[in-house]
Structure formats: C-alpha cells, structure tokens
Amino acid sequence: MVSAILEGKPDKNLILVTGRIHPKLAEDVAEQLGIDVLETTAYDFANGEMYVRYTESVRGADVFVLQSHYKPINKAIMEQLIMIDALKRASARSITAVCPLLGYSRQDKKHRGREPISCRLVFDLLKTAGADRIMSVDLHAAQSQGFFDGPVDHLVAMPVLVDYIRDRFQGHLDNVAVVSPDAGRIRVAEQWAQRLGGGPLAFVHKTRDITRPNQAVANRVVGDVAGKDCVLVDDLIDTAGTIAGACHVLQDAGAKSVTVVATHGVLSGPAVERLKNCGAREVVLTDTVPIPEEKRWDGLTVLSIAPLLASAIRAVFEDGSVAELFDTYPEHHGQGFLFA
C-alpha cells in the first residue's frame, strides 16, 4: 500500500515496484525517496511459470521497476519482463527498468564465430516488453548502453566507493596505489587515481582461455607497487579467481597491503573462500545484489547503493540531470557512505 507519493510536475506520480530478487534494496530506495514500494502479488506456478499483478492502479504513473539480474538470473530477467508487460497493459505513463546489475552484460561482443551477443538481447527484450528507459550501475562495458533504443542512465558506484576508501586511508592517501586487475580496465583505475589525489597506477597482466569460463591467470604486475597500499578495483566479482590471483601477485611484488573494491558482489562458487584467503586487508562491495549472511565475513564491507539509485530516480522523475549527480557527489545527497 502506497502511503506517500512523491510530487513532481502536476499530474505526475512516481511509483516504485520490485521483483523478488532484492526487495531490501527497493525498500531502502523507497525510504530515501519518502515513499513505499507498491505492493505486488507475485508467485510461481507448479510448472515454473510466473504470475504478477499490481494491487493498485498504475494508470498515468511514472513507474520504476527495480530488479537486479542475480541468481537465478534467467528467472530474475523474466520476472522483470513480465512486470513491465503488466505495467504497459495497465496504462503506466512511463516505465523505467532499474537493473542495478544487468544480466549478461559481460557477453557484449563476439569472441568467436557463431556466438551470441547476449547483452544486446537483454536490452531488446526489455524494450519489447515495454521499458521506455533503463537505469543500471557499472555496466561491464559502458558502450553497451548503445544496444538500447532509448535513454540509458549508466550510473557509476565509484563516488560511493571512493568516498569510503578516502575515509579509510585518511592521512595516508599519498601511499595509495590504484590497481586494475587487467589492462582493459586501466581507464577506470585512472579515474579512481584522480579522485584519490593522483597517486600511482598499476595493472595486473593476465591471460584468459576463452574456451574455459571463469578462469584467468594473473601473471605479473605492470607498475611499481612495492611498499604501497594497493586498492584493487573491478566492476564485478564472480568466482573471484581473477581478484584472488591479482592479490597474490601484488603481494609478491612487495605491496604493503591490498584492499579489494568492486561494485557487484556476485560471489559464485568458491568466491568467498578465495577472498578470505587471498591476503586482502579488506573487501569492499556495494549491495547492487543481495549478499546473504552466510557469504559475509569480518573482512567484508558492504556499502549501500540506495542513495545513488534514489537520487537518479528522483532526477529522472523531476526531469533533472542525472549527470550532475556525479559532478556534485557526495555533496548532492549529503549522506556520505551508508552500510548495507
């Protein structure tokens, strides 16, 4: 039941709905916006098909459908598609698919012949279902937002994470080196270094067999990290093979400490054990996907992405600028970092 409606221009109503993957994040976003999540009836039939129905009218509303594409990923995507279809048929004024983690984003190009570009397919499915706009956090490749025929708000968690790291290393930022886990993300590492005061950069050279998923070998460090507090930054940690290997290589190269930072903590299979035993001082993630208690440990810090999502949703609803959020963050939302 909606107890409050965010008022924008006349005759505009904002409604937030959520799938079943990460309702806690939706509740946190709603709290930031000063509204409640619209109640939704959703359940599975015996054969695995899903049913969705909204308990109140959405006619003429600007609706934001929050669903992280997390395990079971195909079910998560399908549920969001069904939710969007129901909104379109119920005459919602506009529909924004809020996908903190967009599924299949790593399959954004063909490595070999006869392969799909699954990321493009997900964008096409969202458009066909009725999404007018997509909002996501740290796509694996920023250019993949061009797959969608419509506006895409590509949010970045870097301000949230940098704010935390700056606080953790207060007084010692001059000894921080930013490290990319591979050459492909060196541009992101450069942006990190600029925000942290222009410290040194390094990257880990790795090799990957494209015929064997979730396997990469970290070979050597390119750059001087001896005696440095290394901040190892990535967009997503899945099985943690790349990150754990990079930690070991950095330690072998004489790093004083290694702090692992990533936006999406998928943490599949052996990831937790690898991260616990990789020698990292701390692992810092955001809550774009749910991280259950059994996957948490003393060395893990989870920051809330809800203030960033709420600010972006508010900007879209009020016809404001999403880009300006990142020019003024954290001053814009005034909350620093929150823990999830």
From Swiss-Prot:
PROSITE patterns: PRPP_SYNTHASE. Mg(2+) 1 binds at H140. Keywords: ATP-binding, Cytoplasm, Kinase, Magnesium, Metal-binding, Nucleotide biosynthesis, Nucleotide-binding, Transferase. It catalyses: D-ribose 5-phosphate + ATP = 5-phospho-alpha-D-ribose 1-diphosphate + AMP + H(+). The keyword Magnesium applies. Its cofactor is Mg(2+). Pathway: Metabolic intermediate biosynthesis; 5-phospho-alpha-D-ribose 1-diphosphate biosynthesis; 5-phospho-alpha-D-ribose 1-diphosphate from D-ribose 5-phosphate (route I): step 1/1. It holds the Pfam family Pribosyltran_N. The active site is at K206. D-ribose 5-phosphate binds at R208, D234, D238, T239, A240, G241, T242. It comes from the Bacteria. Binds 2 Mg(2+) ions per subunit. Gene3D superfamilies: 3.40.50.2020. One of its GO terms (biological process) is ribonucleoside monophosphate biosynthetic process. Mg(2+) 2 binds at D182. ATP binds at N47, G48, E49, R106, Q107. Belongs to the ribose-phosphate pyrophosphokinase family. Class I subfamily. Involved in the biosynthesis of the central metabolite phospho-alpha-D-ribosyl-1-pyrophosphate (PRPP) via the transfer of pyrophosphoryl group from ATP to 1-hydroxyl of ribose-5-phosphate (Rib-5-P). This is Ribose-phosphate pyrophosphokinase.
